[in-house]
Regions:
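Phosphate-backbone binding interfaces of nucleic-acid-interacting proteins
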Residues: 1-202, 206, 339, 358, ...
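A carboxyl-terminal module marker
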Residues: 2, 20, 439-442, 462, ...
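Glycine/proline-enriched, intrinsically flexible loops and inter-domain linkers
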Residues: 5, 23, 53-55, 189, ...
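Conserved mixed alpha/beta core segments that line enzyme active sites in large multi-domain catalysts
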Residues: 33, 47-78, 242, 246, ...
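Beta-rich nucleic-acid/ligand-interaction surfaces
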Residues: 39-43, 200-202, 491-492, 496, ...
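Mobile "lid/hinge" segments at catalytic clefts and subdomain interfaces of large enzymes
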Residues: 114-130, 135-140, 154, 162, ...
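Terminal amphipathic helices with adjacent charged low-complexity linkers/tails
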Residues: 185, 189-214, 391-420
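Extended, well-folded interaction surfaces typified by the phenylalanyl-tRNA synthetase beta subunit core
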Residues: 413-579, 718, 770-774, 782-803
Length: 803
């Protein structure tokens, strides 16, 4: 959040520099991400008074003699501007000066005439009319007549200021405003806080009745509104324009600026409804009806549902509560009567609606973090004061304050000084703690028994118990008072990884060695992800646990498979131009025994592998699995199995012995065609996925690996070209070959052939067999005997012939 240094000074008598204040804010828990000087990039630019002017013949230039005080009383500078006159004070960038954007100014000849600098426009100094009047005029920036020649330009045009870009943590929504930060500044400096004026007077009665009602008090705990007649649209005063500009907003009109100013100053979002556009002069806060539509001020149309909270008139929605007003009720130059709204909306409702619709605003950002129920009262009072001060309209006596019925009371925490010091681990004097809490607008009532009854300000909803009070004390007292000490106990155990953690780390390293990078995704998605993989309705993966309070509808169920998340990551990479990669994720999936759940679900550790790219193939993933098996001293078998999301002819189930571990293969052509990626990517990309039950895999690991010496006898290699039916799988052939003899070691498929010299429905598969005996050299006779047995088994079991 951007907070101008000069605006803070309006509430607190600050006697430190911006840099010193940055350090103090950091010490009390507020990170200043950036301290931005407004005069950044500007040097050696001063006030210059034009004392002589002469038109340069044959050119569009004017030769000026400029008085720049101590820098020289007769500096000659040529300019192409025409809006200046003799005696004007203008910004003069002298020889060796710099301007925003890294522009360096040097003395040079302009069409044959020496020019020792440059006379500047407001734009060249990074100014606009909101920051300094006249800055957007075409030509030079004309400064006030009383400007002193030679004075640095920054204070003259208001650039002697800083912007604090402060990171506001989620637990401090009360600091989402300039006033909120000013409270903290006042406390840390020990200075009084000067509150902005919030008094106003009603001057007339309403010309017609207005109906305001709240049908969803659970989503709108407080709704305040005030009717203002005879609206007078006009320009905002300079000070307000500057406030808005320093925070990154442009001035629009006095009334619109007041609502924006209240948001920035008080942290209270506001909206104003043009009552001439509100049907039935009725405002109703309710849940949207299914299918209702609204066009917001930014001209975007949204279709709503009952999860969305809306502000409606007698006929239609006129605002998305807490997010943005509707185009059908916004003010314009013809507006004459307005109903100003200040409210508190449920943060979860605003967040979900904002994310579901993809619609964000400064208001929604504040409501998502939280706006306390006292804030609308202060915000509305401040806005009405500004309306009266700027003479924007006539404030009527008609106002509304609708609540959910809960009392608005300060939280009370009963504690003792000893408890607070016990949390801190240091001793802080009682009076020091009381002073700190009172500076932070807490009240401390010391009881007869020595305990404290501490009440928190209404805006401090984050304070719940005495440890919170301890935090308030130490961040103001100073963390540097806490002296590091050694533990006073010898019963400290050595850290280390347990067996499961070591196995997981080993798995990750084995996959990393194969060129795979680890991915990390959220533990939830939606049924749309399961639909994307064509998971059948009766599949176990459909028994997903629904989240009662999801972040959004697309994150509404706990995941039952990792593959959908992995595919989303791959698609996201492809959309962003990353056309190849190898990824893995090791994470739990959540499986319910029955729905609705009545016991804790099983969190099954799962391993998912993904590879994508034009050069990736089936053996990329198979090779990674083989490396994994070898690393744990296992042997995997592969069997044909149909999986909804994998290509039926380029996929397999993975087994370790009789235990099924999972599946892997190429993404099915149908699903590949449905992916939201460019057509050329669909045509050129190969996407492979695999998902294994990691717990089942680890159950196959027999403790630590045992040393097996290499055989001193060379293995005998033998190639076999086999003709088989098209439906016969490589796994079936390998399994039959292995069972023929214990001498059979490694089996590698090196060729598949279909075509001439083969009958229809037949294919040729060529394997290299490795035959060895750890105790002796394998003889030629033994090799022939084993090969003969292999061929016999293949013919008997699978009908396979030697080619």
């Amino acid at each position: 959040m951007k907070v101008p240094f000069s605006w803070l000074k309006e509430y607190v008598d600050i006697d430190v520099t911006a840099q010193e204040l940055e350090e103090k804010l950091f010490s009390c828990g507020f990170e200043v991400e950036e301290l931005i000087p407004l005069d950044a990039g500007i040097s050696k630019v001063v006030v210059g008074k034009i004392v002589e002017m002469e038109k340069q013949e044959g050119t569009h230039l004017t030769k000026c003699v400029v008085d720049c005080g101590d820098y020289g009383h007769d500096i000659r500078i040529s300019t192409g501007a025409t809006n200046m006159k003799l005696g004007d004070c203008v910004p003069a960038a002298l020889d060796g000066s710099t301007l925003p954007g890294g522009i360096k100014i040097k003395a040079r000849k302009m069409q044959g005439v020496e020019s020792n600098g440059m006379l500047c426009s407001g734009e060249e100094l990074g100014l606009n009319d909101d920051l300094f009047p006249g800055s957007e005029v075409y030509g030079l920036l004309i400064l006030p007549e009383d400007s002193v020649p030679g004075t640095d330009i920054a204070p003259v045009v208001g650039l002697d200021d800083y912007i604090f870009d402060i990171s506001i943590t989620a637990n401090r929504p009360d600091c989402q405003s300039v006033l909120g930060i000013a409270r903290e500044v006042a406390a840390v400096l020990g200075k009084p806080l000067h509150m902005p004026a919030m008094d106003y007077k009603t001057v007339c009665e309403p010309d017609a009745p207005i109906t305001v009602k709240v049908e969803a008090p659970d989503l709108c705990p407080r709704y305040m509104a005030h009717y203002v007649r005879n609206i007078r649209m006009g320009e905002s005063p300079r000070w307000m324009k500057r406030h808005l500009a320093l925070c990154g907003l442009r001035s629009i009109s006095n009334v619109v600026d007041i609502t924006n100013h209240t948001l920035l100053e008080m942290g209270q979002p506001m909206h104003a409804f043009d009552l001439n556009k509100v049907a039935g002069r009725t405002i109703d806060v309710r849940r949207a009806h299914a299918g209702e539509k609204i066009v917001t001020l930014d001209e975007k149309e949204f279709t709503l549902n009952p999860n969305n909270l809306v502000i409606c008139d007698a006929e239609k929605p006129v605002a998305l509560a807490g997010i943005m007003g509707g185009a059908n009720s916004g003010m314009d130059e013809n507006t004459t009567s307005l109903l100003f709204e200040c409210a508190t909306f449920a943060r979860d409702c605003v967040r979900k609606t904002s994310r579901a619709l993809g619609q964000n605003s400064d208001s929604s950002a504040r409501y998502e973090k939280g706006v306390d129920r006292h804030s609308p009262e202060l915000g509305l009072a401040r806005a009405l004061h500004l309306i009266q001060e700027l003479d924007c309209g006539d404030i009527t006596t008609l106002e509304y304050d609708l609540t959910d019925g809960r009392p608005m009371e300060r939280k009370h925490i009963v504690t003792t000084p000893a408890k607070i010091c016990g949390v801190l681990g240091i001793t802080v004097p009682d009076q020091t703690m009381i002073d700190i809490l009172q500076r932070l607008e807490f009240t401390v009532d010391v009881q007869a028994d020595g305990s404290w009854d501490v009440s928190a300000p209404l805006y401090r909803e984050d304070v719940e118990s005495f440890p919170d009070l301890a935090e308030e004390v130490i961040r103001e007292y100073g963390y540097d008072h806490i002296v590091p000490t050694f533990l006073n106990t010898a019963s400290v155990t050595n850290g280390g990884l347990n067996y499961d953690q070591k196995q997981q780390l080993k798995t990750k390293r084995l996959l990393a060695a194969q060129g795979f990078y680890e991915a990390s995704t959220l533990a939830f998605y939606s049924n749309a992800e399961l639909d994307m993989l064509h998971i059948p309705a009766d599949d176990e993966a459909r028994k997903a646990i629904r989240i009662l309070n999801p972040i959004s509808e697309n994150l509404s169920i706990m995941r039952t498979l990792l593959a959908p998340s992995m595919l989303n990551v791959i698609v996201d990479n492809l959309k962003k131009g990353n056309t190849e990669g190898r990824l893995f994720e090791m994470a739990p999936v959540y499986l319910a025994k029955e729905l609705p759940i009545n016991e804790h679900p099983h969190e099954r550790q799962t391993l998912c592998i993904g590879a994508f790219g034009p050069e990736e193939d089936f053996f990329t993933v198979k090779g990674a699995l083989e490396a994994l098996a070898a690393g744990f001293g296992l042997s995997f078998d592969y069997k044909r199995e149909t999986t909804p999301w994998l290509h039926p002819g380029i996929s397999a189930a993975v087994y370790c012995g009789d235990k099924r571990l999972g599946v892997f293969g190429k993404l099915s052509n149908e699903i590949n065609g449905e992916l939201e990626i460019a057509k050329d990517q669909k045509d050129n990309q190969n996407i492979y996925l695999g998902e294994l039950d990691y717990e089942a895999l680890m159950s196959c690991v027999d403790g630590e690996l045992r040393y097996q010496p290499l055989s001193p006898y060379a293995a005998v290699k033998r190639d076999l070209a086999l003709v088989c039916d098209e439906k016969t799988t490589c796994g079936e052939i390998e399994e039959t070959i292995k069972k023929a003899s214990p001498l059979v070691g490694e089996i590698k498929l090196f060729d598949i052939y279909r075509g001439a010299n083969l009958d229809e429905g037949k294919k040729s598969m060529a394997f290299t067999l490795s035959l060895s005996d750890p105790k002796k050299e394998v003889s030629a006779e033994e090799v022939e005997r084993v090969v003969k047995k292999i061929l016999g088994n293949l013919k008997f079991k699978l009908g396979i012939e030697i080619r």
